[in-house]
Amino acid sequence: MFGKILRSIFGSKNDRELKRMGKQVKLINELESTFVKLTDEELKAKTAEFKKRHQDGESLNALLPEAFAAAREASKRVMGMRHFDVQLIGGMTLHEGCIAEMRTGEGKTLMATLAAYLNAISGKGVHIVTVNDYLARRDANWMTPLYAALGLTTGSVYSMQPQQEKREAYAADITYGTNNEFGFDYLRDNMALRKEDRMQRPLNFAIVDEVDSILIDEARTPLIISGAAEDSSELYRAINKFIPSLKRQEIVEKGEEPSELGHYTLDEKTRQVELTEMGHEVIEDTLTKAGLLKEDDSLYAAGNLGLLHHVYAALKAHVLFHRNVEYIIQNDQVVLIDEHTGRTMAGRRLSEGLHQALEAKEGLQIQAESQTLASTTFQNYFRIYPKLSGMTGTADTEAFEFRHIYGLNVVVIPTNKPIQRTDLNDLVFLSVEEKYEAIVRDVNEYRAKGVPVLVGTASVETSEAMSERLKKADIPHEVLNAKQHEREAEIIANAGRPGNVTIATNMAGRGTDIVLGGNLEAELAKLENPTEEQIAKVKSEWQTRHDQVVAAGGLHIIGTERHESRRIDNQLRGRAGRQGDPGLSRFYLSLEDNLMRIFASDRMRSFMQSIGMEKGEAIEHRMVTNAIEKAQRKVEGRNFDYRKQILEYDDVANDQRRVIYSQRNELLDADEIHDAIDGIRQDVIADVIAGFIPPQSVEEQWDVAGLEQSLANEYGVQLPIQKWLDDDDKLNEESLRDKITQAMDDAYNVKREQLGNSVVMLEKQLMLHVLDQLWKEHLQNMDHLRQGIGLRAYAQKNPKQEYKRESFEMFQTLLESLKHDVIRLLFRVQPMTEEQMNEMEKRRQEEAERQRQRMQLRHAEAPSQLAAPATPATPEELSELKPERPYVRGGSKVGRNDPCPCGSGQKYKSCHGKLTG
């Protein structure tokens, strides 16, 4: 109550932000008359002037009014479009590192050019991130003339792009690309063996389009570059045969007895599958008969955990994954469907054997499992950018998460024209069939009035079921789903024509614009060498259709079910009512819908049945709407807990990733690492000596023979240590250490002379090779640790603390192994001629190219769903989160006197910084 009174007096935070930016808008508008008078060359020269002023110390904030005025003038001349005042506010929002929520059709793509141009003045590059390759290339091609008029270069990156072309795209002032491509290129750069092989410049500023999709919906899926691992396809086939015979046991209330015992339980809310006692017995018996498990052996014995992993993967494939819902079969391959966008995700594979289990289930060829070579998450990748911003039509419902995870505030940008769309209350039916009948009836009615209708569905399966019913009713329509995505542009272009009916999954929700009367630009583009008369005729026909649709009430949206997230529902609604057009939206639900069945309360179900509803009758009541929104909030809260938890675990790996990648880049950039190698060699030799001659020990405790053998076997250096002791009675522990160390230094210097000029390259290449190999093994070990860490809760231990402790110990082991392995290899390496070196480099490049083509770029199903679930965040843990300022990193490199990111508490130079000298 008190908050409402304060808001009525002072306005909301959003209102105050808009008011502040409004003053800048006034200033930009006043500059317009000055920039109109400039010639094209003078306008282009403004960019060089701005760059010079910025280099001389003038901030981008101070340049903003003039830069925005220049960008608007260039847009007017080149594109024929003048930025609205609200787009100027949106551009400022992006520049300040915030998220701009702007309604569909209000011009987000054009708005982004303002912030992109201003930040490109720094010369450090700007990345504009979109959700798919089509949008990235479309936006880049569309906006290139505008940037060129201002003297800036533009590039776009996409998968399987030639390396030189991609390097040029990253060198451009403004680079367009998908979140996947930017993320994978970052990982690939941190696998490069030469600095010339890296693509990206140091990251500077990113504008993320559809930011809620990328930073929230995609946040739970790690980016993984992987290589092939061992083949176990026969095991998948063998286990797949007996999974269908297993029965589900119903989950009952506490104290009740299940009507029938089953082999597994399924919790649809958390998508978790667990074997029951009876299930374990049946599976162990079946595996024993099949010769996969020894007699009297347990499935939970240490040596059989891999077998258990396969069983759970197969069980999940049959119980949690359904064809035409979570995946489709295309060209004899399992192709995943993005639940948020409805689009296929070609090339993306589930991790931990799930994809292989799906291939076995569908009787397809089983592709080999993979081993992680490099990984990160979008959450951690995008937090590397010193400045991050985003734009979307639906962000306000997730403002809390944006602020607490990414430090990004959401600013709701007002529409240029008032919204004319009518959002009707939901209609709720008892059964799915009754719901479908009502939809068919209303679609027919709207169509008869000349109203275009968009029927939104949540899955391919529902879209096909809806299509069958419209066919039976003889209603012509188009279907847009993951199977028909090739015709997407054509279907969307015609979706706004009078009486057209389009069924679409969520893929029609982003990056698409349904124009009332049809897409005029698409029609004109079809004409070959058109005359003025032909163009005028097409425009006249379009105007007639447009006016007809507007008079009929605009585009009507019918939602066939509510999505888990309110944002997805709002995106569907947002297809109607663009730029002040009329429109209407309504959702048709049933008690059999997944969201209602799983999350809605039993009280609502019993209420609807108790009021005696007739067949085909719908209820439209505020209590029902409230219950649905409550269910959605419940799901959104649960998903936020998952994402927060993943971030907490990945932050541990991310700290280690920062150390490794920082050292790797220092190695690549260094001309030579001789001093670092000398320091590492001193540490390694001291460790080896201490293993056989303990510090502050007496001679009787020394294992001199063991030390001689170790130095000979491991490092190829024969030292007569026992003879030294026999010949010199004065040799004590300290002087002996010095003598051994000096002898090893001399041996290495002889090796350096033998290697000649090649030693500089060899030291770097060996260090990189060993580092990459150990990091790859470390990632695999971290995966295994993460999968089982949830079980520590049963031992009254905090899984997160245990994960941090053990992963730190593993990381320490990695760094020690790195030192020892590098020095051992350098001592034993043989000299090569220049011809041999050139041949080795040629083979390395060929192998790198083969590996690049073999690499799988995939998104794991995160977190490990075969692992025991970790405890969700408690309300107390959530309350500890405090709003952060926009995320700004001090630089890409850890300072030598900064605390080491590994968490040891020591300075970086005294801890892991020692590795790079």
Swiss-Prot record:
Its cofactor is Zn(2+). It is found in: Cell inner membrane; Cytoplasm. Transmembrane segments: none annotated. May bind 1 zinc ion per subunit. Zn(2+) binds at residues 900, 902, 911-912. It comes from the Bacteria. Part of the Sec protein translocase complex. Interacts with the SecYEG preprotein conducting channel. Has a central role in coupling the hydrolysis of ATP to the transfer of proteins into and across the cell membrane, serving both as a receptor for the preprotein-SecB complex and as an ATP-driven molecular motor driving the stepwise translocation of polypeptide chains across the membrane. This is Protein translocase subunit SecA.
